[in-house]
Each structure stands twice: as C-alpha cells, then as structure tokens.
C-alpha cells in the first residue's frame, strides 16, 4: 500500500512545528519532489474545515505522488533529504489519530469562528492556522457574519435608545422646568447621559421644548453641576445641524456667552466649543454673538493658559472679525492686539499659533488696529515664527507682516526679522518670496537704520538674485525693485549698495525691466532705482551700454505725450488726473527726467542725450505747472549747459524766457538751476548782456529779509505727502493706492487675499519717485563751474560778478526727498 510505503520511510505530521522548514528549502529547485511537498504544504495537506461528509477523511500527507514513477534514484534522493529535514518520526497510527481529531472538531472550529459567544468556557479548539498573518478560509468567511451580527445588535440597541428617549423626553422636560432645584439637577444629569447616545440625541434635538428647557435651566440655575450637564448636552447637540438650529432658535447664544464668565473649566469648554460650532455652521450666529457681547468676553478669555482652549477662542475671534469693521474695533477696545501678540510670543502649540496669526492678519488691514499691534511688538513676535515647520503658519505671519510693515516706526528691535526676510528671498515658494520682498520694501522706506541692516546682511545681493529668478512675475519684481531703490540711497551704506548691484550683474536685469511687458508701476520703481544707481559714477558706463538712456528718453516722451493728450481732452488740475495702471504720467515724466539729470553728469552721457533731440522737450517742461517737474527739467538743462554746444542748443530752443521767469520761483532748487543755466548761456555774450544777467541773478538769489523766501529745501517724507484728492486735484483712479502701506492690501475684505496679481499692489503712493533729487549738483568739471552755495556774498549789489566765485563742492544744497 502507498500509505504503508511512505510510513515506513518517514511519516509526517501536517501540524508539526517547522513544517516547510530548512529541509524543504534545501531541495533543489528542479527536483520534482520539492514541488510536490510545496503543493501539499500550501493547499492539499491542510484541512479546509468544510468537508462535511461523515465518510470523508482528510487526505493523508503520505499519499503517493505522481512523481513517484520517476525512478528509484530520484526517489532515494527525495527520501534522504526528507529525513535530513526532520528529526522526529511519526507512526501511521499517530497520523491517523491527528486526522481523526481534526475531523471531529470541524464543526467546533466553524462555531468558534462565526459564533464565539456560543462556546463553553475552557474548551480548547485546535487551530489549523499555520501563519497568523494569513487567516484560514473559515476565518475569512466568518467576517461578513460577524459584521451582520454587530449591525443587528446596533439596530436593536439604537431602537431601544430611541424608544427610551421618546418616552422619557416629555417627562424630563417637565422635570427641567420644576421649581425644585434638586429635581432640575437630576433631570439635567439624565438628559446629559441620554445625549451621549446617538439615537436619544436625535430624539432630544427633535424636541424644541426640551432644548428650550435646557437653555432655561442653564441660564437660571446657580448649581454648577446643573449648569455643567445642561451645557454638556447642548455641546453634544451642536455636532448636528438640527441641534445647532434648535439651540439658535431657543436663545441659546446669549446663555452660552453668559457661561464664558464661569470659573468651571468644563463649563467654559462646553460653552466655547458650542459657540464655535454655531459660528461655523449656523447662519445668523455671528450677529447674535456680537449683540450679546461675545467679543468682549472672548477677548477676556485670552489671558487663560490652556493652549487648546485658546485655539478655539482665537478661531471664534477670527470668524467674528473677518470682514466686519465693528468687530475689529471692539477687539481693539478690549485690548485684543496686545493679548494676541502675547500668545504669539508665549506658546509653541502650532494650531494656536496658526489661529492667532489668522486673527492678527484680519486685524492688520484695519488702520486702527495696525498701530496697536506694532506698538505691542507684533512685528518681532510674528518674525519669531518665520522659520517654523508649518507652512500655513509661516504664510499667515508673512501676510500679516506685509500689512503691518508700513506702520513700523522702529518701536521694537526687528533686526532678526530683517535677517530672516533676507533669507526667505531664497525660498522656492513664490508666495513667500512675494511677501518677503514687500515687507523689506516697506521696512526700508525712510528708515536709514533698516537700510543699513539689510545692506550689511547681504540684502542687496539677495534682492538682485531675486530679480534674476523672478523673470516677468511683477508681483515679485516690483517690491524687489522698490526695496533696492530704498537701500541704494539716503543712508551711509548707499554707495556700497549702488556698487553691489553692478558687481552682482544686476544692471542688465534692471534696465530690462524698463521694457515690455513691464507695466507702469514697475517702470516707475525701476526709473527711481536707475536714478539712484546713477549717483555712483562707476555705473554710468554700464547703464549707457545697456541702453538705459535711450529707453528713459522714450519713456519720457511717451509719458509727456500721454499727459498732453489727456490734458487736451479736458483733464484739469496741476496735481493729477493722468493715470495709467494707477500711476500718474506726471510722475513718470518727473522720474525719467530726474534720472537723465544724474546720468548727464557723465560727459559721454551728455553727448548721447544731446544726440537724442530731447532738449526741446526739457525746455517745454519748464512751463509745466508742477514744481517738481520744473526742478528736474532745469536740473538736466544745467548739466547739459556745461558743454558749450549744449548751452547753445538750449538757447536756440527759446529757454531764456522760461528760465528767467523761474529765477523768481519760491522753490530754491528751481531758481538755482535756472540761474546756472542762464549764466552758462551768457558766457559768450557781450559784457553788457552779462552785466544785466548778473544783476538779475543777484536780485533773484539774494532776496532781502522782508521778502518771503521759498519753501524749505527738504522735501516732505512719504508720510507727509497728501493724496491728490486732498490737494484739490483729480480724484484718484480706483486702482491707485491711498496713503498707507504701499505694499499691503487695504480692503474691508482683503484679509485672505492671495499675493496680488501683477501691478495690483506695491504702488508707490502719491509722492515723487525716491529720491528725485538727492542734491542740487549744478555740474562740475566744465568751463562754466558755479558754486550754488554762493558763500559769504554779502547783500545784493547792482553789479554782481559771478566770475569771481571759485568752483567748490556742489553738495552745499543737499536736497533730500521721499523714499517713495
């Protein structure tokens, strides 16, 4: 017999520990015996548990293989390796006994898998599972039956809960309205327990009388436990829209806000979380909370020290303040900004920091809250988290800083913030770079200390690299150019910054921004930057080689033509009205002329400017009603008049009459430039003519004390310049920003706006490009030198000999204006 033959050699227990161990694995792969053994191990030699016939038996593992006929040699080899793999032999009787045991316990195994609760305690059922990671067929088939059983049990329990609650609610409602406080307390506790189960919770929220009774009990009871149970029930109901509606209709919001003064932590938690759910999901809740004084109560709660509680409270404040100016003012009056800044400095719980930064972001667009946040140290507090791993927190901090940055007046130390902002310029996140550029631009505006810090921290190099990477993204290039414009003028390190731009190959990139597709706000900022770079004589040649002069003249002519055309169409008023993309064309005229004035200090540039046939336009600008344009036009003519040919061309264009008129200007800069040009034009004139000019210049430049002198030499800062509408000019274009942050978003609903699209933000206010004139340099190095300071000349005389004035330093009449 086949069974006997295998048994005499080596019988094998299919449940033996180590089945399929090293002995089987050592068989050669090509050996047919190994294939047979693996087949028996994985599928055939295992009891499936579903042979239900009384006469069936598990197949013996010693059955003859079909590979047995492969020859005595192969069979002998298989038997040898089989013996080597196992150290213990089983007799046929033992194998039969184990097979019989498996057959007898088959039904018990099925019952244990599908209905384990029906087995008697202590009964041991042999398992046929070899690998815990691979369930048997019975175990797999039992899963659906177990799920069905649990579903039936849940349905039975749910129905029981629902029936119980439905029968109990009327009685519990009556008890909640009882005059006996003990009865009310017990009823509140029972309702609270019922609200923890879903079925009974639905029954409670479907009873308006029950919810109203809970609200009354919560409001009128002085018992802490009753209040806690009632508030806990409302908290459970607030997780469902139907529950929120019933709480709202029953007047639950005023009652919940009253609980915000409770000294009990659990009551506070129930109240604030329920209010939070109402604010998020129930229409009308925001107004109800405001009317009930919820904002004041919530701000008072900011002094608590539970981070998770504070996170919910600050999120409520954000929901209430967003888009509602009245709420922002209430938060301000309640001391909210200082409390929020304290949270940003004190805690490290990410969710709390995120929700708090969201409130600050909403408040940062309010002109009343901005100074309060800054004075409380909000700038440095927000800067602490710019290196946080949470991207959403970093982004909120940057947005808030951008909105606040125009309000900073050096009240706190922001050097670490500036250092972090310079580092963020290297970020791969466009939003981060956009915000960082805008913040740097605002913080360096009219702030010499911040300019120095940024320059010393390699900020100029970082800004140039940012321009190179930004390409045509004007939401980045415009604030970056503005920041560069600020750090290259009016501080001790300005000249170093001007050189740094050139040494980092920034001039080609900057000049390129004067060309399309750049729009007017970016062009305006770039013109101002080029004007500052031209203050460094080493930059004159690179700017000329990159075609800066040609492009500046083109922009000047285009802007002037646009101004003339719009004026002829009926635009009146000398201070504005000609806007394009929110930029006054008069500002472009002034900026380009001012840049050409500084570039004209170089003799090669003067020759190039003369060859571009723009002297007639400069002369025409002398008639302009805007004083700043008169000043820069006279300034560039004073440089061009250094060359004899230039002076002759200026005279041929009829400049004598307007220049003579400008000698009487109340602006000292205009009068001084006009005098210089007239003097140089008179060089080759007869002596009598020169004498008359000298007398005229003397009477104009040396006015007596009884005659009112002109305006102060210094231009007002950017914070003193009034908007066009306040000066009687044309009302500003809707896209033109009003005074305030030139790089912040000012809108009643601007709290969550993404970084603005190109040219929608970062406009440069209403002032002239920074700085139009840093000094009244009347030129030098030519044959017609003149000291504008005119030192110790004494009183006016009838005959003033200007030839006797020696050449001197031309910085005596330093003329500073705004960083805008």
Curated annotation (Swiss-Prot):
GO cellular component: a single term: cytoplasm
Listed InterPro entries: ARM-like (IPR011989), ARM-type_fold (IPR016024), Armadillo (IPR000225), Beta-catenin (IPR013284)
Protein name in the entry: Catenin beta
Phylogenetic lineage: Eukaryota, Metazoa, Echinodermata, Eleutherozoa, Echinozoa
Cell compartments where the protein resides: Cytoplasm; Cytoplasm, Cytoskeleton
ARM repeats: 157-196, 199-239, 241-280, 283-322, 367-405, 406-445, 448-489, 495-535, 603-642, 644-683
This protein's record includes keyword Isomerase: no
Species of origin: Tripneustes gratilla
A Pfam family: Arm
GO BP annotations listed: cell adhesion
Any GO molecular function: cadherin binding
Region feature Disordered, mapped onto this chain: 1-74, 708-811
Family matches, as Gene3D superfamilies: Leucine-rich Repeat Variant (1.25.10.10)
Purpose of the protein: Binds to the cytoplasmic domain of the cell-cell adhesion molecule E-cadherin, and perhaps to other (membrane) proteins. The association of catenins to cadherins produces a complex which is linked to the actin filament network, and which seems to be of primary importance for cadherins cell-adhesion properties.
């Amino acid at each position: 017999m086949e069974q006997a033959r295998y048994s005499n050699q080596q019988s094998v227990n299919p449940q033996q520990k180590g089945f399929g161990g090293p002995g089987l694995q050592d068989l050669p792969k090509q050996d047919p015996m190994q294939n047979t053994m693996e087949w028996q191990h994985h599928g055939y030699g295992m009891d499936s548990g579903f042979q239900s016939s009384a006469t069936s038996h598990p197949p013996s593992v010693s059955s003859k293989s079909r590979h047995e006929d492969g020859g005595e040699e192969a069979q002998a080899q298989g038997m040898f390796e089989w013996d080597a793999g196992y150290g213990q032999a089983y007799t046929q009787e033992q194998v039969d006994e184990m097979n019989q045991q498996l057959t007898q316990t088959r039904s018990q195994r099925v019952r244990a898998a599908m209905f384990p609760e029906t087995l008697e305690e202590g009964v041991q059922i042999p398992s046929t599972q070899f690998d815990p990671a691979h369930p048997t067929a019975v175990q797999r088939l039992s899963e659906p039956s177990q799920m069905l059983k649990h579903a039936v049990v849940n349905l039975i329990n749910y129905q029981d809960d629902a029936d119980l609650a439905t029968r109990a609610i009327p009685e519990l409602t009556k008890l909640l309205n009882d005059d006996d406080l003990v009865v009310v307390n017990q009823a509140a506790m029972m309702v609270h327990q019922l609200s923890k189960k879903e079925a009974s919770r639905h029954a409670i929220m479907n009873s308006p009388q029950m919810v109203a009774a809970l609200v009354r009990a919560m409001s009128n009871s002085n018992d802490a436990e009753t209040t806690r149970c009632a508030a806990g029930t409302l908290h459970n109901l607030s997780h469902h829209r139907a529950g929120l509606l019933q709480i709202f209709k029953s007047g639950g919001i005023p009652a919940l806000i009253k609980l915000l003064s409770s000294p009990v932590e659990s009551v506070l938690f129930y109240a604030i979380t329920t209010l939070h759910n109402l604010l998020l999901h129930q229409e009308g809740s925001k107004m109800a909370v405001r009317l009930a004084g919820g904002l004041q109560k919530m701000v008072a709660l900011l002094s608590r020290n539970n981070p998770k509680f504070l996170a919910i409270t600050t999120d409520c404040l954000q929901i209430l303040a967003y888009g509602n100016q009245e709420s922002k003012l209430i938060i301000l009056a309640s001391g909210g900004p200082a409390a929020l800044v304290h949270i940003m400095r004190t805690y490290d719980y990410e969710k709390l920091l995120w929700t708090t930064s969201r409130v600050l972001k909403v408040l940062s667009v309010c002109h009343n809250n901005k100074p309060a946040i800054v004075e409380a140290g909000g700038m440095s507090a927000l800067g602490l988290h710019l290196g946080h791993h949470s991207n959403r927190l970093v982004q909120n901090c940057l947005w808030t800083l951008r909105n606040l940055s125009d309000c900073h007046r050096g009240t706190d130390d922001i050097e670490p913030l500036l250092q972090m902002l310079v580092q963020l310029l290297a970020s791969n996140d466009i939003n981060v770079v956009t915000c960082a550029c805008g913040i740097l631009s605002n913080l360096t505006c009219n702030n010499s200390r911040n300019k120095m810090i940024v320059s010393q921290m390699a900020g100029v190099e970082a800004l140039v690299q940012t321009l190179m990477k930004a390409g045509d993204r004007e939401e980045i290039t415009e604030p970056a150019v503005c920041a560069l414009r600020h750090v290259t003028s009016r501080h001790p390190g300005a000249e170093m910054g001007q050189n740094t731009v050139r040494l980092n190959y920034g001039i080609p990139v900057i000049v390129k921004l004067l060309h399309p597709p750049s729009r007017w706000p970016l062009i305006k900022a770039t013109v101002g930057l080029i004007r500052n770079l031209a203050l460094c004589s080493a930059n004159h040649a690179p700017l000329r080689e990159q075609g800066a002069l040609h492009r500046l003249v083109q922009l000047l002519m285009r802007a002037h033509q646009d101004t003339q055309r719009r004026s002829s169409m009926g635009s009146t008023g000398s201070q504005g009205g000609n806007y394009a993309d929110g930029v006054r064309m008069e500002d472009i005229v002034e900026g380009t002329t001012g840049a050409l004035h500084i570039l004209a200090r170089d003799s090669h540039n003067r020759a190039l400017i003369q060859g571009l046939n723009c002297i007639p336009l400069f002369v025409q600008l002398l008639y302009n009603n805007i004083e700043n344009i008169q000043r820069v036009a006279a300034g560039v003519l004073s440089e061009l008049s250094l060359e004899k040919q230039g002076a002759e061309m200026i005279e041929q264009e009829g400049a004598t009459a307007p220049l003579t008129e400008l000698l009487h200007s109340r602006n000292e800069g205009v009068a001084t430039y006009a005098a210089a040009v007239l003097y140089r034009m008179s060089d080759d004139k007869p002596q009598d003519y020169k004498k008359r000019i000298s007398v005229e210049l003397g009477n104009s430049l040396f006015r007596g004390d009884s005659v009112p002198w002109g305006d102060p030499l210094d231009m007002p800062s950017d914070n003193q310049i009034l908007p066009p509408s306040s000066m009687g000019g044309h009302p500003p274009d809707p896209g033109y920003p009003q005074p305030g942050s030139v790089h912040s978003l000012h809108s009643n609903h601007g709290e969550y706006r993404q970084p603005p699209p190109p040219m929608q933000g970062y406009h440069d206010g209403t002032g002239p490009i920074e700085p139009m004139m840093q000094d009244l340099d009347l030129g030098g190095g030519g044959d017609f030198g003149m000291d504008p300071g005119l030192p110790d000349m004494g009183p006016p005389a009838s005959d003033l000999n200007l030839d006797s004035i020696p050449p001197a330093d031309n910085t005596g009449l330093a003329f500073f204006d705004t960083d805008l």
